[in-house]
Amino acid sequence: MAPSSKSERNSGAGSGGGGPGGAGGKRAAGRRREHVLKQLERVKISGQLSPRLFRKLPPRVCVSLKNIVDEDFLYAGHIFLGFSKCGRYVLSYTSSSGDDDFSFYIYHLYWWEFNVHSKLKLVRQVRLFQDEEIYSDLYLTVCEWPSDASKVIVFGFNTRSANGMLMNMMMMSDENHRDIYVSTVAVPPPGRCAACQDASRAHPGDPNAQCLRHGFMLHTKYQVVYPFPTFQPAFQLKKDQVVLLNTSYSLVACAVSVHSAGDRSFCQILYDHSTCPLAPASPPEPQSPELPPALPSFCPEAAPARSSGSPEPSPAIAKAKEFVADIFRRAKEAKGGVPEEARPALCPGPSGSRCRAHSEPLALCGETAPRDSPPASEAPASEPGYVNYTKLYYVLESGEGTEPEDELEDDKISLPFVVTDLRGRNLRPMRERTAVQGQYLTVEQLTLDFEYVINEVIRHDATWGHQFCSFSDYDIVILEVCPETNQVLINIGLLLLAFPSPTEEGQLRPKTYHTSLKVAWDLNTGIFETVSVGDLTEVKGQTSGSVWSSYRKSCVDMVMKWLVPESSGRYVNRMTNEALHKGCSLKVLADSERYTWIVL
């Protein structure tokens, strides 16, 4: 007889009887046991133990937030984010603003020392995004590098504009622009070093009296445009001490480190010009779309010239291109630019710009580079025009009345940084560290210009380069970062105007196409290498939003196909206030490595 109630059906399914329910229960239990065994077997293959296996296990320690934090802090509006990677600290933040529409938001970040048998102890409080005028509540993300536990980096995303009246009065950014705020803050040390003790003796009673290594703050702000770059902390922070910032116009690699005067172990992190020896030349093989392109750990040989079998552009296309190029040429000469015949020769290579002078203009409308130029070794060595490198040393002023040195000129390329200590004193930037005494903070910036790279790749490596007219928009997604070889693989989605293939019938008018360019950028040399160039896909009736949406989905699929398991400790710890913006709260703050929960 069939069970008459849900409880009877459940009990029948879970019993060991010989009925169908009992057999089904055995099969289900067997499947569950088999699944766990398969997962554990996979550990031997991948070398990584997935924490998902133990998510339903009770934590070793489970405490309530109300029992370890005074109510005054909760009433003050503390939003608790999570545990640090080391498990020693719990982080929270507060945001405050006035009652009127013209007041700014002010953010503070807090470190609380966690102890199972006592209440949380506040050990550090810092103000984020120093002196920035923030008119709306931010999405915050606090991140830690895989192995660098000396500092955290905080991103603030302004995803919606202020109200219309304030925008009109203050001339703020419109819906096509978003502000990104970044603060890098030193983590409180577990104990006081000798330099911290000296600072405490110099400023008795001041909890913010710390040495520079354990007490610096670095702030910057930049603006991104549509299509707004994807936030990818797992890739942007994959290399310790380095953060990759996509500013919509360039990719900026920033390295932050603290050193002492006379430190012989100083090592430049970026752009140290270290390269591996050249590999023997080999003919290129077709790349399967299912396999990830190998990140070049060496400088490959020059790319072959375009085959003679490629279709030649029709006379109408050539005439139209020459007309456009002539207009640009005349405008350049009218402004006192360099004439066409005075330009230096290009060096052969996939990017064709290793020995390019900074002042050389970009190729226009599909101009091709001369393939009979002299070898790169014979050309004068100069930095590629698509790369900018700066290194500044920040030091604390020695006295209150010290006259600052000459102001450093803004190169309009590097991101501006404000560096302070915990007591709010600004650090002065210097280009040379010869006169530095005591501790100093080094900020390196290596910048890759997207538009220059796009023009170079199309000019030298695109089989459809003879059809190209201009590009209208682009979107950059990081596909992989190799911290050992310092290679960054990026995918450039491109909306462009190009003439149709000569084989197509109809009028010779430019059409809108979409394509993608994969490029590997070397953080040691600043040089990029073209990995692959996609075919042209005509955009028919699609909005730019749908084009970028499908492009980013394809990037996600590509990354998931290439995903390689890493050591459980080599991850970027990420804490956000996303739940707050969704109108809800986290249930627990979990330290999965130590099986500790704080119930909210």
Swiss-Prot record:
Effect recorded for L244P: Decreased interaction with DDB1, DDA1 and RBM39 in presence of indisulam
Bias kind Pro residues: ranges: 280-295
Keywords: Immunity, Metal-binding, Phosphoprotein, Ubl conjugation pathway, Zinc
A GO term, aspect molecular function: metal ion binding
Result when mutating F129 to S/V: Abolished interaction with DDB1, DDA1 and RBM39 in presence of indisulam
CDD domains with a match to the protein in the record: DCAF15-CTD, DCAF15-NTD
Result of changing D475 to H/N/V: Decreased interaction with RBM39 in presence of indisulam, without affecting interaction with DDA1 and DDB1
Highest taxon listed in the record's lineage: Eukaryota
Example GO BP: immune system process
Comp. bias intervals (Gly residues): 13-27
Pfam families to which the protein is assigned, alphabetical: DCAF15_WD40 (PF14939)
Disordered: region residues: 1-30, 280-316
Binding site for Zn(2+): C193, C196, C211, H214
GO cellular component, one term: Cul4-RING E3 ubiquitin ligase complex
Amino acids binding E7820: F231, A234, F235
Modified residues (Phosphoserine): S50, S310, S314
Modulation of this protein's activity: Aryl sulfonamide anticancer drugs change the substrate specificity of DCAF15 by acting as a molecular glue that promotes binding between DCAF15 and weak affinity interactors, such as RBM39.
Annotated consequence of substituting Q232R: Decreased interaction with RBM39 in presence of indisulam, without affecting interaction with DDA1 and DDB1
Pathway the protein takes part in: Protein modification; protein ubiquitination
InterPro entries: DCAF15, DCAF15_C, DCAF15_WD40
Subunit record text: Component of the DCX(DCAF15) complex, also named CLR4(DCAF15) complex, composed of DCAF15, DDB1, cullin-4 (CUL4A or CUL4B), DDA1 and RBX1.
Known function: Substrate-recognition component of the DCX(DCAF15) complex, a cullin-4-RING E3 ubiquitin-protein ligase complex that mediates ubiquitination and degradation of target proteins. The DCX(DCAF15) complex acts as a regulator of the natural killer (NK) cells effector functions, possibly by mediating ubiquitination and degradation of cohesin subunits SMC1A and SMC3. May play a role in the activation of antigen-presenting cells (APC) and their interaction with NK cells. Binding of aryl sulfonamide anticancer drugs, such as indisulam (E7070) or E7820, change the substrate specificity of the DCX(DCAF15) complex, leading to promote ubiquitination and degradation of splicing factor RBM39. RBM39 degradation results in splicing defects and death in cancer cell lines. Aryl sulfonamide anticancer drugs change the substrate specificity of DCAF15 by acting as a molecular glue that promotes binding between DCAF15 and weak affinity interactor RBM39. Aryl sulfonamide anticancer drugs also promote ubiquitination and degradation of RBM23 and PRPF39.
Protein name: DDB1- and CUL4-associated factor 15
Species whose genome carries this gene: Homo sapiens (Human)
